[in-house]
Amino acid sequence: MKIPRPLPADLTSKSFTTQEALDAGVSVGRLRYRDLDSPSRAIRVPRLETEHAFADMVRPITQVTPFSAASHATAFLLWGFPGFLPGSHEPGIHISRPHAMAIPRRRGVVGHRGQFFEDEITTFNGLLITSRARTWLDCARKMDIDEITVVADHLLRIPRPEFEGRSSPHCTMDELEEMLDRHWGTPGIRKARLALEQACVGSDSAPETRLRLALKWAGLPTAEVNVPTELSPGVVRQPDLAYREQRVAVEYEGEGHSDPEQIVRDIAREEDYSRAGWILVRISKGHMSNNARSAVAKVRRALEQRGWSPK
């Protein structure tokens, strides 16, 4: 039986729109699994008894292995991290124990051990698990720098209380930096440091982070990320990326933008930008293939139309 990838933690115990899920990095295919009810178009409600099946598989293993906690790829999945972690869906439950204990050895288990500070072990649905910050560091060894940044942006993102029921980010920049300082010799830490240097607080989704990084690596100017921008008196928009000097806005549009009501809102948004003399660059999943080559070209053309040129 194929186990569905766990939803982001913020979506596991409440109804949500498909756009909220897509913005959180959930795939369209994941939204079709039978563990999600659809009481109305574009609405999903988790069937909690099924949604927690993965945690229920992990919990007994940690219970019979003293001083252990879910970690590495298993914690990555349980926390619902975005980003590509090679091997994350391979068989085997990852658990860790302190250095002083033996490495866990049990059929179906991938054992680890390491140094753990008290605040690096927490609980998830009654299951002992490495904290989000520690999980981020543990998984950095296998990830590339940009994908580590995708996870860092997810942890640093300021949530929307009206939709997510929380007002604080999962982690602060200081907390992630402290995690690196504590474990300065651990494998992958150099990549994690480089990733944290290019992380930002404002990115709302994994595709937005990948787009921002692709534009950076292409040598385009640095954009403001999800900053409210007054287009004209009384008209404020919050583009995913804004080049205020060139009056160019960039929006990444997930599949939820095909909804008829969303199309109407998108047209109104584009009209606002046009009336204010801004260029709105709309990016979709199709533009992100081949290292976002098409997306970079679209943004570059818009900037050049406004007089920007490479130095």
Model-inferred region functions:
Residues A9, E20, G25, P159-K311:
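Surface segments flanking catalytic/ligand-binding clefts of nucleic-acid enzymes
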